UniProtKB/Swiss-Prot annotation:
Residues 1-244 form the Deacetylase sirtuin-type domain. NAD-dependent protein deacetylase which modulates the activities of several enzymes which are inactive in their acetylated form. It holds the Pfam family SIR2. This is NAD-dependent protein deacetylase. The gene is cobB. The lineage of its organism: Bacteria, Pseudomonadati, Pseudomonadota, Betaproteobacteria, Neisseriales. Its cofactor is Zn(2+). It is an enzyme of class 2 (transferase). NAD(+) binds at residues 27, 31, 38-39, 107, 109-110, 125, 192-193, 217, 235. It catalyses: N(6)-acetyl-L-lysyl-[protein] + NAD(+) + H2O = 2''-O-acetyl-ADP-D-ribose + nicotinamide + L-lysyl-[protein]. Its main location: cytoplasm. NCBIfam families: PRK00481.1-4. It comes from Chromobacterium violaceum (strain ATCC 12472 / DSM 30191 / JCM 1249 / CCUG 213 / NBRC 12614 / NCIMB 9131 / NCTC 9757 / MK).
Length: 244
């Protein structure tokens, strides 16, 4: 499904009329780079253990080795560096390069926004690209993590924890994200089903504050009524049409 010309015209009008733009991106942004959406019906996780248990902070603390086996399986750790930014990522980077103040609030942990050239990126759920020691806080790069079945801190030997927000942990940047959205002149949501709290409340607060909101997502969300514009289409295709 593609955006209609009327939808594209309205979206161009919203983007052109805003100097400060907040962009909330979800898994649908990265699936166009070939990264599976682990939460989808045909996603990566189909084991007996629930996803929320497998990538929970409690499971990490209880059994780091089993946690890392599940974590690698779910997030394809060995392939992370092979994925490339897509047209959606590049569109946002180009928008920033054009002089607009674009702040990306991403739920994704793949680092593709930064690799595309975006500089103002809040990784709300952390990043797969590093892991840190929970005891001495020593950081370790992805290539080190990829080489070890159970990555241990090179300084103190403790099991490393991936620098992602696990189930059971708070989202440390959530207040900053809300503030960025409320300071914007446009909130653009791309590739998010808006199922994960508290991030899904960002468009609620933005709409309540009178900020124009637009959504690009393959499927409807339960918050569609909040948006001034909803486009059910691919992100890359929509962004290519916008730049045409």
């Amino acid at each position: 499904m593609s955006a209609t010309e009327r939808q594209l015209q309205y979206l161009r009008q919203l983007v052109d009329g805003a100097r400060r733009i907040a962009v909330l991106t979800g898994a649908g942004m990265s699936t166009e780079s070939g990264i599976p959406d682990f939460r989808s019906a045909d996603g990566l996780w189909s084991r007996d253990m629930s996803l929320t248990d497998a990538v929970s902070v409690d499971y990490f603390r209880r059994d780091p080795a089993a946690f890392w086996r599940a974590f690698r399986d779910i997030f394809h750790i060995k392939l992370v560096g092979d994925y490339q930014p897509n047209d959606g990522h590049r569109f946002l980077a180009a928008l920033e390069a054009s002089g607009k103040e674009v702040t990306i609030l991403t739920q994704n942990i793949d680092g593709l926004h930064g690799r595309a050239g975006s500089r103002r990126v809040l990784e709300l759920h952390g990043t797969l690209l590093t892991a840190s020691c929970p005891d001495c806080r020593s950081p370790h790069p992805l290539d080190y993590v990829q080489r070890h079945e159970l990555p241990a801190c090179r300084r103190c030997g403790a099991a490393l924890k991936p620098d992602v927000v696990l189930y059971g942990e708070a989202v440390p940047l959530i207040d900053v994200a809300f503030q960025a959205a409320l300071n914007a002149e446009l909130l653009l949501v791309m590739g998010s089903s808006l199922e994960v709290s508290p991030v899904n409340l960002i468009p609620v607060e933005a709409a309540r504050a009178g900020i124009p909101c637009a959504l690009i997502n393959y499927t409807p969300t339960r918050f569609d009524a909040l948006f001034d514009l909803c486009i059910q289409a691919g992100i890359g295709d929509t962004c290519r049409q916008l730049r045409a």
